[in-house]
Regions:
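Short, contiguous strand/loop micro-motifs
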Residues: 4-6, 161, 178-179, 203-204
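Residue-level signal for well-ordered alpha-helical positions
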Residues: 81, 101, 180, 207-208
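Secondary-structure boundary/capping positions in well-ordered alpha/beta enzyme cores
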Residues: 56, 85, 155-156, 202
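GST-like domain detector, emphasizing the conserved glutathione-binding G-site
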Residues: 1-130
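Long hydrophobic alpha-helical segments typical of transmembrane helices together
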Residues: 187-222
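GST-like fold's C-terminal all-alpha helical module
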Residues: 105-197
Length: 222
């Protein structure tokens, strides 16, 4: 059975992405959660991860003797291992688009990621209002995200019709927009609700809300 090493569900966006793929497609895996430490240098968390792999980060997937790190690499590995399942869209054109937007998510939207860290417990709406008014780059990044989502196959569907790796990659963006209550269009809100109602997303968020806060990871006062 595969083993997926993750960190706190309340904070770890990169852990969330492959976990959602594994869970949504009912793939056999064992979740191993290594909680973040309060120490600035990572403390026990960093030590435990370095003992597993030189990368020292989550997520980490172990499949027999194979170790795969980085969320995108893990998802590509899963798509190769389970080719009978539509982890990527079957249509070549849709698959190319899905891969492109995942790669863009993987390498872009730095302001959103730095200013609006994932936290599934508090309501940061008042912080979101301030950040939105102060940061033009943040507004531009959200506009680009909305543009991507507006190209989905159907307004009431997932990005490529059915839930896929692409949706898993943008789920932490959905939660950020919700936690910080950033202003978005009705079209975007419909996609957000579609994601937030997915059973795997519900399962992750439910578990995240039961976790104890890690002070070091709390970006803003609650």
């Amino acid at each position: 059975m595969m083993q997926l090493y993750i960190a706190n569900k309340n904070y770890s966006t990169w852990s969330m992405r492959p976990w959602l793929v594994l869970h949504a497609f009912n793939l056999p895996f064992q979740e191993i959660l290594i909680p973040f430490s309060e120490e600035a240098d990572g403390g026990a968390f960093k030590q435990q991860m370095l003992a597993l792999h030189a990368n020292g980060k989550v997520p980490l997937l172990q499949h027999d003797a194979v170790m795969i790190w980085d969320s995108l690499a893990i998802c590509e590995y899963l798509a190769e291992q389970f080719q009978e399942l539509p982890l990527w869209p079957k249509d070549p054109t849709q698959r190319a688009w899905a891969r492109s937007i995942c790669a863009e998510m993987h390498s872009s939207f730095m302001q959103l990621r730095s200013l609006c860290s994932m936290n599934l417990q508090p309501d940061y709406g008042r912080h979101g209002q301030r950040l939105w008014s102060e940061h033009a780059v943040l507004r531009a990044e959200v506009a680009r995200i909305e543009q991507i989502w507006s190209n989905r196959a159907a307004v009431d569907g997932f990005l490529c019709g059915e839930f896929s790796i692409a949706d898993a990659f943008f789920t932490p963006v959905v939660t950020r927009l919700q936690t910080f209550q950033l202003p978005v269009s009705d079209n975007t809100q419909r996609y957000m609700q579609k994601i937030l109602q997915h059973p795997s997303v519900v399962a992750w968020i439910t578990a995240a809300q039961l976790e104890q806060p890690v002070r070091r990871m709390e970006q803003y006062p609650r």
